[in-house]
Amino acid sequence: MTPWLGLVVLLGSWSLGDWGAEACTCSPSHPQDAFCNSDIVIRAKVVGKKLVKEGPFGTLVYTIKQMKMYRGFTKMPHVQYIHTEASESLCGLKLEVNKYQYLLTGRVYDGKMYTGLCNFVERWDQLTLSQRKGLNYRYHLGCNCKIKSCYYLPCYVTSKNECLWTDMLSNFGYPGYQSKHYACIRQKGGYCSWYRGWAPPDKSIINATDP
């Protein structure tokens, strides 16, 4: 499962009632951006699913057992169902029932939580310790910062609230070291920079450790 969040590009055509979608393409997003741009962020286990006849291919409705909520307390304090397209070509998400705990992110529409391949969704046991700590408090602290993607050199930050995200330049690709181990947080002096550490950042921090 690929934890992406961003632009969805559906390649296909719709004619005479037939939907010819062929692919789902998403732009990469740092987990912190995925967190800050989501209405709902929860840890949950899927306990059931059913196919509902909505749209050209239907909608999968997963029944979940919510373990913990990280974001969305005012939007939907308790989530029991999540909705996704039944077709993966439309960015529908396939989850295992009664097998894993997942980190789930998504948006709320008409009182329902929706998610898909372009959202940050990952098995809980696949998250790094830094990512788990980010969910608890660090990502929230960085929601006023901007993570700037770098695909080709040279890349520069253009304002003090930016962190340069260079995972895509690595031979290892995405998700890379910054995605797995760093959060972009506002530091002393009002500048945003990459942070990694075991204690939450506070006023005593002068310089962040850069990747």
UniProtKB/Swiss-Prot annotation:
Its main location: secreted. Disulfide bonds join C24-C91, C26-C118, C36-C143, C145-C192, C150-C155, C163-C184. It comes from the Eukaryota. SUPFAM superfamilies: TIMP-like. Residues 105-188 are annotated as: Mediates interaction with EFEMP1. Glycans are attached at N207. It is found in: Secreted, Extracellular space, Extracellular matrix. This is Metalloproteinase inhibitor 3.
